[in-house]
């Protein structure tokens, strides 16, 4: 069984130093994870992210590593609004230079929950619009964070087409799944679907067409239920695959096969 973790923050300080990141990669490979996508969060850590990915590519070749650059909506609270345009211009320059391993734009999006309250909704929308324009200009997919803002995100995506993108750690309803999929986008599920009373993500997982289904850990956050209180890591993606398989009443091997193929197709990666 081969799995693709489409969202894991292996570069975060919670994974310690380079040695600990490499060990996490080896554990992931032993669990059947063949590829991991590590997204950016804030401009000040882009260089460290690219260095971490380069190190993993060189020293943990048991897993194929990819990355993305963007500005997370929660990171806006720490960014002076006067710097927004400069940060977005720097992002565009980085993306156009296409550093090794960069296959997407993000993590970016909208967070209208408490964690995103440090930036106004208007500011979040403006920053996301810039990411959407960059995706249109480059043809790269987006890694979209969306919390309590699905209707607004749908409106933005409907204004002008963007390349097929990923709804990361989907928290919306099953009823909204068709609207996102009509735009060509994929829906990714994380550890929340493993929780005992997680009815909403299970219903959503059933509603996603097979060719739009993805898996992720969102490590180090969202540890699957059976692994708590441990820090989450890509090796635990197996638990999420099993939970999605159970929700859809399908063999876990079939879920692994289709989600890995979907990720490679959307990110335009060779098998």
Description of each model-found segment:
Residues 1-271:
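Mid-domain alpha/beta scaffold segments of enzyme catalytic cores
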